[in-house]
């Protein structure tokens, strides 16, 4: 998507971003810098493009996906699961769907701060393992946001993953 933007900001002066799917994306930056907005913009534009043939961008080339998976705002199910358990369950659900479909299907996934409900060391390790597992599937594209620089460093020179960083002006 060339110069895509978040539709609810249509009447304002939205920041436009270009998003390509030649490699999977890992986006790092501080809170309130727009990471989640890029995820939402991309998935909204993907759905609009596939369903209606247009979206909120200057131009786009879209190779349709058969499955779109979202890991945003995982609820802490009070009294039942910890946040970490809820996050792990959601990751497993996504992996099960990917694993159980044939390789002709295409999957697009957005992950907003994997395992934010646990300590940084375990979260980083779990996030790295999750990304590593996804890499075995050529039919899966993803955008992942994170605060963990260890995840970014691990995939710094990876052939299927590109790191991005959002700067914040204070």
Regions flagged by a language model, labelled:
Residues 1-170:
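ATPase nucleotide-binding head domains, primarily ABC-like/P-loop NTPase cores
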